[in-house]
């Protein structure tokens, strides 16, 4: 019997726990995620998607953004949440008393909790310049791949990612540590490096045109490599041979 999974990282986990026959069948990207060349404008627009799941790193995104660009009109952050947003502004890192919601404290942060259909999501990606995704781990990770497919510079942890080669110079360092969310994610997690996220967000802000050109140039190749038909044919070709 075979075990099927979505990434090389997941396959290694299964193999390390005693499953010798593991097949990797990655997710693909739909053609609607068309590439768009982003150019420097008066405002650099950051995007984070993943709330309210703590594993997606939304709170770290808010902390770093407000530290670097809080209330700076040249930069904005949009958080797209599913129903609820859990990010908050705290008085400090010791007491951690809540001051309020990020969009109530900072005039350059927007939070979206409404449901979006696929076309609205594609437009949301196209309307923004940089995706910030300091995930603590994914089974595959659709959100960064969708951003990369549109040519968007993407700051993302990478050890778990099947498409890590496409994350390029904005790969975010992380450390494998014990999970702090045993109730939801027992075991190990990839904890993003806060200081490295600060460095990457600052660098992409100051050198946006260079990063935009780099990520746009590879977007067509991403669509080729993650074409659903091609991935499916590759995954099932051995099965086709057995029954043909």
Name what the model sees in each region.
Residues 153-157, 168-171:
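Short hydrophobic beta-strand element within catalytic cores of glycosyltransferases
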Residues 39-56, 62-66, 77-79:
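Conserved donor-binding/catalytic core segment of Leloir-type glycosyltransferases
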Residues 88-119:
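Nucleotide-activated donor-binding/catalytic signature segment of Leloir-type glycosyltransferases, i.e.
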Residues 9, 28:
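Carbohydrate-associated surface elements
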Residues 189-196, 206-238:
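A charged, aromatic-enriched C-terminal amphipathic alpha-helix characteristic of glycosyltransferases
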